[in-house]
Curated annotation (Swiss-Prot):
Disulfide bonds: none annotated. InterPro entries: Marvel, Synaptogyrin. Expressed in brain and placenta. One of its GO terms (cellular component) is membrane. It comes from Homo sapiens (Human). This is Synaptogyrin-3. The gene is SYNGR3. GO terms for molecular function: SH2 domain binding.
């Protein structure tokens, strides 16, 4: 298919790096990529603190190791997904098959919607566990990391919801058949059937018409005629 489809130009067209970097979808992916680092980075570095009763490390979120693991997994998954989808956006212009483009947009739409929901769950979960955390020297030391993870979890909800909306717009846009249809219609309308050649050597536009059928009646008497003497 030569026409544009799913918000991209014709297959094989050159990619403009400046326009690609200024696209809202690209900016949202970069923002989501940065937010994911700001979530799992502080949890990995400062999310586990020593308890007052022993040297073992516990999660800063109310000692719930599941909260720390969930935050790290969510942020790391978003980090890898943003990198993969950025690469897909770069290669999207080179995909010539409309079916493959549709699958790529559906994958983007489904993953963005799923991660928007997971970020909402993660934000609520981390906030709830942090509110239940008992104050102490350890929690005071890692408090900034916990609050940063919660804040950027909220920002990630907004960025991934925006990515979902952009993917939905691309899916609804679908295949743009207007260029292809216009070219075909204009070509068909302007092309005429050739006429028959005339004596001057120039093709005429008049159509050949057969002469009307005329029947000549024979009025002479039929049969044997007696000669006159």
């Amino acid at each position: 298919m030569e026409g544009a489809s799913f918000g991209a130009g014709r297959a094989g067209a050159a990619l403009d790096p400046v326009s690609f970097a200024r696209r809202p979808q690209t900016l949202l992916r970069v923002a989501s990529w940065v937010f994911s680092i700001a979530v799992f980075g502080p949890i990995v570095n400062e999310g586990y603190v020593n308890t007052d009763s022993g040297p073992e490390l516990r999660c800063v979120f109310n000692g719930n190791a599941g909260a720390c693991r969930f935050g790290v997994a969510l942020g790391l998954g978003a980090f890898l997904a943003c990198a993969a989808f950025l690469l897909l956006d770069v290669r999207f212009q080179q995909i010539s098959s409309v079916r493959d483009r549709r699958r790529a947009v559906l994958l983007d739409l489904g993953f963005s919607g799923l991660w928007s929901f997971l970020w909402f769950v993660g934000f609520c979960f981390l906030t709830n566990q942090w509110q239940r955390t008992a104050p102490g020297p350890a929690t005071t030391q890692a408090g900034d990391a916990a609050r940063a993870a919660i804040a950027f979890s909220f920002f990630s909800i907004l960025s991934w919801v925006a990515l979902t909306v952009k993917a939905l717009q691309r899916f609804r846009l679908g295949t743009d058949m207007s260029l292809f249809a216009t070219e075909q219609l204009s070509t068909g309308a302007s092309q005429a059937y050739p006429g028959y050649p005339v004596g001057s050597g120039v093709e005429g536009t008049e159509t050949y018409q057969s002469p009307p059928f005329t029947e000549t009646l024979d009025t002479s008497p039929k049969g044997y005629q007696v000669p006159a003497y």
